[in-house]
UniProtKB/Swiss-Prot annotation:
This is Transcription factor WRKY45-2. Plants overexpressing WRKY45 exhibit enhanced resistance to the rice blast fungus Magnaporthe oryzae, the bacterial blight Xanthomonas oryzae pv oryzae (Xoo), and the bacterial streak Xanthomonas oryzae pv oryzicola (Xoc). Enhanced resistance to bacterial pathogens is associated with increased accumulation of jasmonate (JA). PROSITE patterns: WRKY. Induction: Induced by abscisic acid in aleurone cells. Induced by salicylic acid (SA) and infection with the rice blast fungus Magnaporthe oryzae. Induced by cold stress. Down-regulated by drought stress. Residues 67-110, 256-284 are annotated as: Disordered. It comes from Oryza sativa subsp. indica (Rice). It is found in: Nucleus. Keywords: Activator, DNA-binding, Nucleus, Plant defense, Stress response, Transcription, Transcription regulation. Residues 112-180 bind DNA. The keyword Disulfide bond does not apply. The keyword DNA-binding applies.
Length: 322
């Protein structure tokens, strides 16, 4: 009875397709006649769209009906059957193919059966799912260092149905992360300043005030006390700067013929400090205003305060009147 009724759908399908094509052509002619009416044109567009959608659906149904039997047999061979020779599967062919694809994707990882889930890696659970025809759910884990070290390793854990004490673990991807607890410790060691050395400058090749920091994985060797009698515990790195040269001033300054003055004085000083050499100075050559800001002329200031009998009033110096 089935064989006598099987050719029937072919003429019916052809008749339906012919009628749909004719209706579509008539709607197109109507669209040409109603071109000047925007409202009528919109209705005709909807009619044409409906015809086109119905024809596509009819084509898809005909292809599914023609290849349904062959698809069912191929699905039974590929995925493993469970249906009898005289019966058919209740699930659609599309669902069976999707199930086969899911099984193939799940088996792409490395699956092991273990008693203990501790594998020495850091995992974070991000989901759990009930599995069809299984007594226990499946848990999904990702590496803890997914976001800070971009590690894409994953694992799926499910308790075995036949042995509840065992777990079926599927590993997907490889660990590219590094545990911070086992990473080598980088220590910063300060090379102490050497007070005396064998170099010509007497500083062991280092400028005054310079510091060097080296980053090594091993502990630093102990510093010999004899080689470095003077050490510094300041760990701030300072760039070596120019050495300060003494300024020699010649002329009558008390009983001393020469006096060394640092050259890093304020710009408000006299030409003697800028030039480096000056003649004798008298008390009237002292810059009183600059002396209030500690930028007075060194030579004149020393000559001025040399006389113990000098008495001055602070108000007179400031030039203030109350």
């Amino acid at each position: 009875m089935t064989s006598s009724m099987s050719p029937a759908p072919a003429p019916a399908y052809a008749q339906v397709m012919e009628d749909m094509e004719k209706g579509k052509e008539l709607a197109a002619q109507l669209q040409g006649l109603l071109r000047d009416s925007p409202e009528a044109g919109r209705f005709v567009d909807q009619i044409l769209h409906t015809f086109s959608r119905a024809m596509r659906a009819l084509d898809k149904a005909a292809v599914s009906a023609a290849g349904g039997e062959g698809s069912e047999v191929q699905s039974e061979v590929t995925c493993g059957g469970g249906a009898s020779a005289g019966g058919k599967r209740k699930a659609p062919a599309a669902n069976r193919k999707a199930n086969c694809r899911r099984r193939t994707q799940q088996s792409s990882g490395n699956t092991v059966v273990v008693k203990n889930l501790d594998d020495g890696q850091a995992w974070r659970k991000y989901g759990q799912k009930e599995i069809q025809n299984s007594k226990h759910p499946k848990a999904y884990f990702r590496c803890t260092h997914k976001y800070d070290q971009m590690c894409t390793a994953q694992r799926q854990v499910q308790r075995c149905d036949d042995d509840p004490a065992s777990y079926r673990v599927t590993y997907i991807g490889e660990h590219t992360c590094r545990d911070p607890a086992t990473a080598p410790i980088i220590a910063a060691h300060v090379i102490h300043q050497v007070a005396a050395g064998d170099d010509d400058d007497g500083c062991g090749g280092l400028h005054a005030g310079s510091r060097l920091i080296s980053f090594v994985a091993a502990p630093a060797a102990p510093v010999d006390a004899a080689a470095a009698p003077t050490t510094s515990t300041i760990t701030t790195v300072t760039a070596p700067g120019p050495l300060l040269q003494p300024l020699k001033v010649e002329g009558g300054i008390g009983s001393s013929d020469q006096e060394e003055v640092l050259s890093s004085l304020t710009p408000g000083s006299s030409a003697a400090r800028g030039g480096g050499v000056a003649g004798p100075f008298g008390p009237d050559q002292g810059d009183v205003t600059s002396s209030l800001h500690w930028s007075y002329d060194a030579v004149a200031g020393m000559e001025f305060f040399k006389n113990d009998e000098v008495v001055f009033d602070l108000d007179d110096i400031m030039g203030l009147s109350f």
